[in-house]
Amino acid sequence: LLACLFGNGRCSSNRDCCELTPVCKRGSCVSSGPGLVGGILGGIL
């Protein structure tokens, strides 16, 4: 659950990801929304 919350979940498609990080990008779940979390995750990945 923590891995999912922090966007570290491995994925092959968006449906493998959780609500807070619903988009699969380069094999990892990331946030698709605007704001601090999305910006940080987007910057790292």
UniProtKB/Swiss-Prot annotation:
One of its GO terms (molecular function) is calcium channel inhibitor activity. Disulfide bonds join 4-18, 11-24, 17-29. GO terms for cellular component: extracellular region. Pfam families: Toxin_23. SUPFAM superfamilies: omega toxin-like (SSF57059). Keywords: Calcium channel impairing toxin, Disulfide bond, Ion channel impairing toxin, Knottin, Neurotoxin, Secreted, Toxin, Voltage-gated calcium channel impairing toxin. It is found in: Secreted. Expressed by the venom gland. InterPro entries: Omega_atracotoxin_CS2, Toxin_23. Belongs to the neurotoxin 15 family. 02 (omega-actx) subfamily. Potent inhibitor of insect (bee brain), but not mammalian (rat trigeminal neurons), voltage-gated calcium channels (Cav). In vivo, injection into lone star ticks (Amblyomma americanum) induces curling of all eight legs into closed loops, followed by death. The presence of a 'disulfide through disulfide knot' structurally defines this protein as a knottin. This is Omega-hexatoxin-Hv2a. It comes from Hadronyche versuta (Blue mountains funnel-web spider).
